[in-house]
Structure formats: C-alpha cells, structure tokens
UniProtKB/Swiss-Prot annotation:
It comes from the Eukaryota. Residues 78-193, 332-598, 635-705 form a coiled coil. Its main location: nucleus. GO terms for biological process: cell division; homologous chromosome pairing at meiosis; reciprocal meiotic recombination. It is found in: Nucleus. The keyword NAD does not apply. GO terms for cellular component: nucleus; synaptonemal complex. The lineage of its organism: Eukaryota, Viridiplantae, Streptophyta, Embryophyta, Tracheophyta. Residues 731-743 have a biased composition (Basic and acidic residues). This is Synaptonemal complex protein 2.
Length: 856
C-alpha cells in the first residue's frame, strides 16, 4: 500500500497494532460517596471493569475498521492481479514473436530439405539410367536367346510336321481296323454286355471328372503361388530355355524311336489281325454257349438296382461338387481380377516413369509372344504324337495279351472274353489318363512361359472353357443316364423273354455238350499253332531291336554335330547383337543425361525464385506483426496507467473519508470521557477532604490515648504520631515473633512504607509510574479485577497500547489505620496487662464507638 502511494495508511496501521486503546481514558482512584464504606479500591475496580468493557467495544469498532481496510487491500490486490495479467499478456506476445521466429526457422529448414530432395532426385535419375542400361543389356541377351531358340524350333517344327503326317496315316489305319473289330464284337455281344460296358464307362467318367476336379483345385492353388513367383520366374526364363532345348532334343530322339516301334507294331498288328480272324471263326462256333450267361443275368439284375441307388448318390454328389467348383472359379476369378488390377496400377506407374523404355518393351513382348505361340504349337504337336503313340501301344499290348490268353485257355472262352473286354476298357482309361496328364504338363509349361497378363487371361479363359466342357459332359451324362434307364426297362422285357428261352436252352445243352468235345480237339490244334507263332514273333522282335539300336546311335551322332554348329552360330550372333545394343544404350544415356541436366537447372532456378518471394513475404509479415505488437503494447500500457490512477484516487478518497469519520468519533468519545473524568476528580477531592478531617480526628484521639498510656508529654506524641506508626508495628511484630533480627528487615520492607504513606501519597505514586521513559502528555494506571494494569500513552499523532503486566504473587499491603497501630502497640508493650484492655472495653473511653469509618 505504501509503495502504491498511500501515506495516510501508516497511521491507520499503527492503530491496528494497539488493541483496546480507543477507549482507555484516565481516571482517578478516588471512590464515590456511596461506596465509602467498602473502600476506594473496590470502586476503582468497578471503574476498571467499565473501562475494559469500553475497550472491548472499541476493539469491535477497530475490527470493523480492519475489515474495511482488508476490503481495500483486496481491491488493491485485484489491481495488482490486473497488472500481472497485463504483464502476462506482454509475455504471451513475446512468446508469439518467438513462435514466429521458430516458424521462420522451420521455413528455412524446409528450404534446406527441398535442396536435399533435389539432390536425391538427381541420384535417383542416375540410378534409373543405370537400370536402363542393365535392362537394355538383358534385352539384347534375351533377343539372342530367342533367335537361336526360334531357329531350333523351326527345324523341330518341320520334323514334327513330317512325323505328324506319318502318325496321322498310322492312326487312320489303326482306327479303321479298330472299328472293324468293334463292329464284329458288337454284333456278337448281347445287350446285357453293352449295358456292362456303359456302366463301366460312366464309372470311369465319374472318376475322371473327380480327378479333373482335384487337378483343377491343385492347379488353382498352384496358379496363386505362380502369380506371386512370376517376377522371380522371369529372371529364370533364360535358364529354363536352355533346359527346354535339351528336352526338345530328347523328344526328337524319342520320336525316332517311336517311328521304329510303329513299323514293328504295324507288322505285329498284321499278324494279330490274321490271328483275330481265326479267333472270330472259333467264336462263331461258341455262340451257342450263351445259356451259361442266364444265371449271370439274374445277378446283373440285382447289381442293376444297387447301381441305380449308387448312381443317384453320385449324381447328387456331382451336383454339389459342381456348385463348389463354380464357387472356386468365382473366387479364383475375383482374386485374379484383384491381382490383375494391382498389377495394372503398378504397370501404369512404371510406364509413367519410364516412357522411353515402352517402345523397347513392346518389341520384346511381341517377340516373346511369337516365340510362345511357336512353342505352344510345337508342344501341342508333340503332345498329340505322344498321346496317339501311347494309345496305340497300350491297345496293341493289351490285345496281344488277350489273344494269347484266348488261345491258351480255350476251355473258359466266355469268361476270358469278358476279362479281355475289361482289360481293353482299362487300357482305354489309362491311355486317356495319360493324355490328360500330358495335357496338364504341357499347359503348365505354357503357363510358365507366358507373361503376367497373358497367363492370367489364359487361365481365366481355360477355366471358363473347362467349366463349359464339364457342363456339356454333365448334360451328356444325364442323357446317357436317361438312355440307360430306358435300356434297363428294355432289359427287363428281355429277361422275361429269356425265361422262355431257358427252356429251349435246356434242350440245346445236350447238343452243345457234343459240340464241346469237337471244340476241344480244335483247341488243341490251335495251341500248337500259337506256340509256333510265338517263336517266330520272338525272333522278329530281337532282330528289330538290334536294328533300332544301330539307328539310334547314328541319330545321336548327327544331333551332336548339329548342336555344335548351332552353338557356334549362336555365339557369333550374340557378340554382334551385344555390340550393337551397347552403342544404342550409350546414345540413349547421353540423351537422358542432357534432358535431366536441363530439368535440374530449371528446377533450381524456380526454387531460387520461390525462395526470394517467400523471404520478401516473410520480412513484410514480420514488420506488420511488430508494428501491431507495439501498438497493442502502447494501448495496454495507457489503459493500465489510467486504471491504476483511477484506483489510487478512489482508494485515497475512501481512506480519507474513513479517517475523518474515525477522527470525529474519537474526538466525541474523548470529550465524553473528559467530562466523566472531571466529575470523578471532583468526587475524589471531596473524599480526600473527608479523609483529612477523619485523620485530624484520629490524631486527636491518638493523642488522648498516648496521654493515657504513657507518661510522655502530649506535644511530643503529637509531633511523632505520624512517624511512629511503623515503629509501633515493628515492636508488636517483634514481641509476637520473639526476635530482634527481624526488626531491621521489617523497617526496610516496602510494607512498612505502605503503612506510613497516606492516601494522597498513594494517589501521587499511582499518577507517576516509572515504567515508561518517554511520556508526552499524560499517563494513568488503573487496577482491574484480574490484577492487570493497562497503560495508555497519548502522543501527538499516534496512540499505542502496552501489554498488561502479569500479576505478582505477592500480597498487597494493607493500609495501617491509627486504630490498628494502637492495637498492635498495646499488644506489644503490654502483652499480659488486663487492665488496659478493660479501658477500651468501656463505652465511655472507646474513641471509635461513634466513628462509622473506624476499622475493626
């Protein structure tokens, strides 16, 4: 408060440090007239209590004043808080300025980061140039590989075409003969046998379809893995091409072997055809043995019912499996489309970054497509040749075995014919399975050689085609099932007819037994003929094997010479292509470096221009911010100064008003206390006059007593009456205690002095205490009930309160009146005199009988 310019608060703070000083006024210790009998000290105590109550009331007033002061101090504290808020705002503005500086530093760091980015871009461009060089080198290497492979494949194509023509001719001959054999067999066999063959065919088809489904699932899983491995497989293509060349050479050798085997097979087929003609003649004789099959027909009827139930179950399973295949196809197509979309996005990015390499990539892709098409055609031709050869070989082997068994076991001709039919069907199945396996292998080779996009599209198309074929096959199987159901009905009618024929067969059994005897003789002759034919056939095979081994050796030597010549040509062409492509790559690199240098120079110029513009804008913004900040600081300071001045003026006015009010109240209270003090002083003076009169009376009475008690003249007693009060009291005490040593201590004690002193001297001593050294106007001392003595010192400007003194443990001395002194002296001088006591017991001689103020 004093720092803010409130000098008037000093006096008021001093008032706060003096509790109870506002109403401590000076009073005399003279008792009023009404309480003269109880003593002056009791009255003084009552007045002191009143003063204490007045002090308490004054304290409450001072507390109210203190509360008001606290409120004013709170107002001042609020002003100080406003000052602090203003300082905080200034600090915030400084913080904002620092933040702007940090932003500027951040912009500078961004500019430095842009420079580093430019440097990184230059490095990346250099890296791309190096990658372009590597790609062009790889391109040249692949072109050389493809050229060599194309030449080799063309030569192989020519050879394969020749082989295909020969194989087609052989196929036509074999098919014609097979058709003739099948027609003969179909004519011989009954409808029941046809039903069995169809049943086996349907079972085999179902098994094949199950195998195809499993293979499709495996191929789908493999394709997913292959899509992920395409990038790695592209790098390994050049290694695979070399391996495939070796495989092609191996296939050529196999084709030559097949041609030799084909000639051998043709010779053997001619011989077997002759044998089949003979066997057919024998089979015609055995047509009458059909009655043995009647018992088997009953069993077939039972099997037919079980087959129907199983067929229904299989059809249901096939439908569910077909639905699962469709779902798998949809999922595979969705995944393929997603991967295709991702690959397309990657390709667009790469195309945007490498526009210069698009032309070269397109050329390479076209060449690769052409090579792949050529390769596919070769593989398809080879697969067809393999399939046809395997079919013919298997069929011929099984037929030869069947014929040998027929010739060896003529007794059970019918059962052996059934077994031969089953073996032929199994051979057909195995040949078809081999075909499918070879086709799957060829398709996998084709898929591996194609690019990412072509593989995905080809897989999708193949899956669609396979599903369509499966659907068609399922429809055809359903039609076949309907036909089989119709045939079953027909067979039932036939069975009824056969019941009638059984009776006829029983009659014909006798005739057949006779014919069997004749057939046995014919079989013995046939066995001898077959043994001779086997020997001749073995000799032919050994001779043909020797010729084939010689021919294979010659072919291997020729192939080795051709391969060495092809390698020499390939190396020469490779060196030429590498040199030409190196020149092209160097030219392209020079052009790209010039373009990139120009682009970098342009980017640097633009970045410099942008830096200059941004620096100018930043400097202008900083100037504007500083001007705004200075204007805000000036406005805030002016507002703050005005508020401080207004608050100071208000506080000073309030303090002045309060001080004037307190001074007026204090003056009025002082005047009232002065009036009371004057009245009390007058009363005390009257009491003093009365006490003086009493003392005079007492002195007269004492003189009379001394006259009676001693022989001393009355004049000396009157003179020494005031002086000998203490000596008489000392004598009385010495007589009671019985010692002279205590007399000296009693004369020096303060109690004796108190006895000698009068009431006027006591009042003078009370009005002049020796506690304070500096007294400006007046000091008063009043005794309260608690024994505390509050003192008030009045100065010119301030009033201070002293802490009350603690009550002493000593007993207050009693004032010695003349009667008490006389009693003590009488007891001391005449301790054992009874006559003197009798004098005071009489009413005429007692001087205090009529005195109401005398002490007992």
């Amino acid at each position: 408060m004093q720092k803010l310019g409130f000098p008037a608060m000093k006096s008021f703070d001093q008032l706060r440090s003096l509790p109870g000083s506002a109403k401590t006024y000076f009073f005399s210790t003279r008792p009023p007239q009404d309480s003269v009998s109880s003593g002056s000290f009791s009255n003084l105590k009552l007045t002191a209590e009143k003063l204490v109550k007045d002090q308490a009331a004054m304290r409450t007033d001072l507390e109210l004043a203190n509360c008001k002061l606290k409120k004013s101090m709170e107002h001042v504290y609020a002003l100080e808080e406003k000052l602090q808020s203003a300082f905080n705002e200034n600090a915030k503005l400084r913080v904002r300025q620092k933040e702007d500086e940090k932003l500027w530093r951040g912009l500078e760091s961004k500019f430095s980061s842009t420079k580093t980015l430019c440097d990184q871009l230059t490095e990346t461009l250099q890296h791309l140039a190096s990658q372009v060089q590597d790609a062009e080198k790889d391109k040249g290497f692949f072109e050389t590989k493809f050229n060599t492979s194309s030449e080799a494949i063309n030569s192989l194509n020519q050879q394969m075409r020749d082989m295909s023509l020969r194989l087609d001719a052989a196929k036509e001959e074999i098919t014609s003969r097979d058709k003739e054999l099948e027609e003969l067999k179909l004519e011989k066999q009954h409808k029941e046998m046809f039903y069995q063959t169809e049943r086996c065919g349907t079972a085999s088809l179902i098994e094949k379809k199950d195998a195809v489904i499993t293979e499709l699932e495996t191929t789908a899983a493999e394709r997913k893995l292959k899509i992920e491995k395409l990038n790695s497989q592209l790098e390994k293509l050049h290694l695979e091409l070399t391996t495939k060349e070796d495989e092609v050479i191996h296939l050529v050798s196999i084709q030559e072997k097949l041609e030799k085997e084909k000639t051998n097979v043709q010779l053997s087929s001619d011989e077997l055809f002759e044998k089949l003609v003979r066997s057919e003649q024998e089979v015609k004789k055995l047509d009458e043995l059909v009655h043995y099959l009647i018992a088997e027909l009953t069993e077939l009827d039972k099997k037919n019912l079980t087959f129907k139930e199983k067929f229904d179950k299989l059809s249901g399973l096939y439908d569910t499996h077909f639905m699962l295949l469709r779902k798998d196809r949809d999922l595979a197509s969705d995944r393929a489309q997603r991967s295709f979309d991702q690959l397309q996005g990657e390709l667009f990015r790469v195309a945007a970054e490498k526009e210069a390499l698009e032309s070269s990539g397109n050329e390479l892709s076209e060449k690769i497509v052409e090579l792949q098409n050529d390769k596919e055609s070769l593989i398809s031709q080879l697969s067809g040749v393999r399939c046809s050869a395997s079919q013919t070989i298997d069929k011929l082997e099984f037929e030869a075995k069947g014929l040998v068994l027929k010739n060896a076991e003529t007794e059970s001709v019918i059962s052996k014919l059934k077994e031969e039919i089953d073996t032929l069907l199994e051979s057909v199945r195995t040949s078809e399975d081999k075909k499918k396996e070879l086709s799957i292998k060829l398709s996998s080779l084709e898929i591996e050689s194609k690019d990412k996009y072509e593989k995905l599209q080809a897989d999708a198309q193949r899956q669609v085609g396979e599903l369509e074929t499966l659907q068609k096959e399922s429809e055809s199987h359903q039609l076949q099932a309907d036909l089989l159901a119709k045939e079953v009905n027909q067979l039932q009618t036939i069975i009824e007819e056969k019941g009638h024929l059984i009776l006829q067969c029983n009659e014909n059994e006798k005739n057949i037994n006779q014919q069997i005897i004749k057939d046995k003789e014919l079989l013995a002759t046939a066995e001898t003929k077959l043994a001779e034919a086997k020997k001749q056939y073995d000799l032919m095979l050994e001779s043909k094997q020797l010729e084939l081994s010689r021919h294979l050796k010659e072919l291997s030597q020729r192939n080795d010479q051709a391969i060495n010549e092809i390698r020499r040509k390939y190396d020469v062409e490779k060196h030429e292509i590498i040199n030409s492509e190196k020149d092209k790559v160097e030219k392209i690199i020079k052009e790209l470096s010039t373009k990139y240098d120009k682009g970098l120079s342009d980017c640097k110029e633009e970045s410099k221009r942008q830096l200059l513009t941004i620096q100018e804008e930043h400097s202008s913004r900083i100037l504007n911010i500083r001007e705004e900040h200075e204007s805000k600081e000036l406005n805030l300071k002016a507002k703050y100064d005005q508020e401080l001045r207004q608050n100071q003026i208000q506080a000073e006015n309030e303090l002045k008003e309060r001080i004037t009010a307190l001074k007026s109240e204090h003056d009025a209270q002082l005047k009232a206390f002065k009036c009371q003090y004057e009245d009390d002083c007058k009363k005390l003076q009257e009491e003093l006059d009365l006490q003086r009169k009493k003392e005079e009376r007492q002195r007269a009475l004492v003189q009379l007593q001394w006259k009676v008690m001693s022989d001393n003249p009355p004049e000396e007693q009157e003179v020494n009456s005031n002086k000998d009060y203490s000596h008489s009291s000392v004598k009385v005490k010495e007589s009671r205690l019985g010692g002279n040593k205590r007399s000296e201590h009693i004369t020096e004690s303060p109690f004796v002095k108190a006895k000698v002193t009068s009431v006027s001297n006591i009042l003078k001593e009370a009005t002049n205490p020796k506690h304070h050294s500096k007294v400006t106007h007046r000091e008063y001392e009043v005794e309260t009930n608690n024994g505390r003595i509050p003192k008030r010192r009045k100065t010119r400007q301030t009033t201070m309160f002293q802490e009350p003194q603690r009550r002493s443990t000593r007993l207050t001395p009693k004032l010695m009146t003349p009667t008490i002194i006389a009693k003590e002296t009488a007891m001391a001088d005449h301790p054992h005199s009874a006559n003197i006591g009798d004098l005071f017991s009489e009413g005429s001689l007692n001087p205090y009988a009529d005195d109401p103020y005398a002490f007992d």
